[in-house]
């Protein structure tokens, strides 16, 4: 049993209408035929009243109505398209009584399928009939005329734009998209639970920049008659958290993995804090101590839930010479199953050190990289040929120097140029987009909506995703499980303040809830 929406069997009978073009050709036969066939083609991302009227009119002109839809790979009309994955779009059309058959067109235009299926009629919307025939429409007319088919234009008294609907108010199809993806991949919710069980005991080595995230909670003091705009607050308490690459290590450990952490620290109080924190979590820390630098600490001053000021204590000089050599020695002979480069650009990673650090990674182990663009300029493209990279949209656009392309073509370009095996592009509240191979195959990429319910603090959610996606791949569970579990964990992390370590128990509860929702329980 797969993860499809668990409706009664009779409610799912309409799925029999969805055919490959070869199956459809065998059913409708060649041209000419006794029963007339009319074909409509489009994205059908959101089926609205304009679509319904178009389909109803088309069906009135023939015996059989074939709804052809553009596959995901060729929809590049706007930022959020396609909003509904192709399998779910096909199911939506098949559920309409007026539609006899549905076919997913894997080509950029319907020309090839018109030539192959040879419908008696091909229906176009009224907006195309304005006295000027676009070149693409003329090509369709010529293809139809070559065997005796005809073009029909449907009445256009009701016209809607799916793109405008989606951009203004996107409906929540998170659960439906998840269930459709799992169904197409033959995945069950039990498979997700089993993946979590496999994480215990896996060995992962994290190499990266340590950051101490400090929160100083204050109470505002009235400025009284002060003649200067001086901000005055009273100290109440301070809370310190391990951040940066250290929190990635803690996420991995919370999932049950055996974790080694290599980093560079200053010889100061914050060094002692991070070493104690790692030991408390059961993480083996292999620090390189550089007495000439400070341990990175980023402090936020908070009063009445407002962040008044951020103060950074940091040394961004690139590591060189002895420090670089010592850091490489901490992982060169490591027996870990996977290695994570967590780059915050605070000295360890740069254009000069990355090739050297990458070369020292043990052969055959899984290689993962994440490079952040925040106060510093990391470039994910400097990590070439890795098994997994997890940039966010800003980091991807920075690496490509591309501010303008819509998401999916931009993601594909990044995937190709990075030479990686798997790209999980983080899109914030819009979820994730995953590329698993660079081709025109419709399964080359897939999307997931955000799983966050009540967002409290999204900072650090990407680190949680990175950790669980890494463990999924180390456990041999594949890109779909890696993306789903990573996205679920990121959603949970958003619901907590600070660097919260999500546990497998919390993830299991969220998976249970998702399964109930898709079963309509």
What spans do the regions from the language model cover?
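Nucleotidyltransferase catalytic core that binds NTPs
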Residues: 1-184
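Short, glycine-rich nucleotide/cofactor-binding loops
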Residues: 39-51, 207, 233-242, 347-348
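Conserved phosphate/ATP/ADP-binding segment of small-molecule kinases
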Residues: 193, 338, 351-445
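Conserved post-catalytic alpha-helical subdomain immediately downstream of the catalytic base
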Residues: 418-422, 451-515
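Glycine-rich phosphate/adenosyl-contacting loop at the front of the ribokinase-like
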Residues: 179-260, 449-456, 519-521
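Substrate-binding N-lobe of the ribokinase-like
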Residues: 202, 230-296, 510-513
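Conserved phosphate-binding/catalytic loop of the ribokinase/pfkB sugar-kinase fold
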Residues: 287-293, 300-334
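Short acidic, glycine-rich surface-loop motifs adjacent to enzyme active sites
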Residues: 336-350
């Amino acid at each position: 049993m797969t993860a499809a929406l668990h409706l009664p069997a009779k409610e799912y009978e309409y799925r029999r209408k969805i055919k490959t073009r070869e199956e459809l050709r065998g059913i409708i036969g060649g041209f000419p035929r006794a029963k007339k066939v009319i074909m409509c083609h489009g994205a059908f991302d959101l089926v609205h009243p304009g679509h319904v009227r178009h389909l109803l009119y088309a069906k009135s002109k023939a015996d059989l109505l074939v709804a052809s839809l553009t596959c995901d790979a060729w929809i590049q009309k706007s930022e959020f398209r396609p909003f509904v994955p192709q399998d779910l779009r096909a199911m939506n059309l098949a559920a309409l009584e007026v539609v006899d058959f549905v076919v997913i067109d894997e080509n950029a235009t319907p020309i090839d399928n018109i030539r192959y299926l040879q419908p008696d009629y091909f229906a176009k919307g009224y907006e195309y009939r304005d006295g000027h025939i676009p070149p693409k429409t003329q090509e369709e007319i010529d293809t139809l005329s070559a065997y005796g088919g005809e073009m029909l234009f449907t009445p256009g008294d009701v016209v809607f734009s799916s793109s405008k609907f989606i951009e203004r108010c996107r409906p929540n199809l998170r659960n439906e998209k998840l269930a459709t993806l799992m169904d197409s991949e033959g995945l069950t919710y039990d498979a997700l639970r089993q993946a979590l069980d496999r994480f215990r005991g896996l060995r992962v080595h994290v190499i990266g920049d340590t950051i101490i995230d400090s929160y100083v909670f204050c109470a505002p003091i009235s400025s009284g008659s002060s003649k200067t705009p001086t901000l005055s607050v009273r100290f109440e308490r301070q809370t310190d958290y391990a951040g940066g690459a250290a929190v990635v290590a803690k996420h991995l450990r919370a999932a049950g993995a055996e974790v080694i952490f290599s980093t560079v620290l200053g010889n100061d109080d914050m060094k002692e804090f991070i070493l104690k924190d790692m030991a408390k979590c059961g993480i083996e820390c292999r620090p390189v101590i550089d007495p000439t630098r400070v341990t990175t600490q980023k402090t936020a001053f908070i009063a009445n839930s407002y962040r008044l000021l951020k103060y950074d204590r940091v040394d961004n000089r690139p590591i060189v010479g002895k420090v670089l050599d010592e850091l490489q020695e901490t992982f060169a002979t490591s027996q870990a199953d996977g290695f994570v480069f967590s780059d915050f650009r605070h000295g360890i990673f740069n254009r000069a050190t990355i090739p050297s650090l990458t070369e020292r990674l043990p052969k055959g182990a899984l290689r993962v990289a994440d490079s952040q663009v925040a106060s510093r300029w990391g470039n994910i493209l400097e990590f070439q040929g890795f098994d997994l990279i997890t940039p966010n949209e800003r980091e991807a656009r920075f690496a490509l120097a591309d501010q303008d392309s819509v998401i999916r073509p931009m993601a594909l370009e990044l995937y190709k140029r990075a030479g990686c095996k798997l790209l999980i592009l983080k899109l914030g509240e819009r979820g994730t987009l995953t590329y698993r191979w660079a081709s025109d195959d419709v399964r080359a990429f897939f999307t997931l909506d955000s799983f966050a319910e009540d967002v409290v603090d999204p900072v650090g959610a990407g680190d949680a995703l990175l950790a669980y996606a890494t463990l999924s791949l180390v456990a041999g569970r594949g890109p779909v499980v890696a993306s789903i579990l990573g996205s679920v964990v990121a959603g949970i992390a958003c619901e907590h303040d600070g660097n919260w370590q999500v546990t497998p128990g919390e993830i299991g509860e969220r998976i249970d809830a998702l399964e109930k929702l898709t079963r309509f329980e």
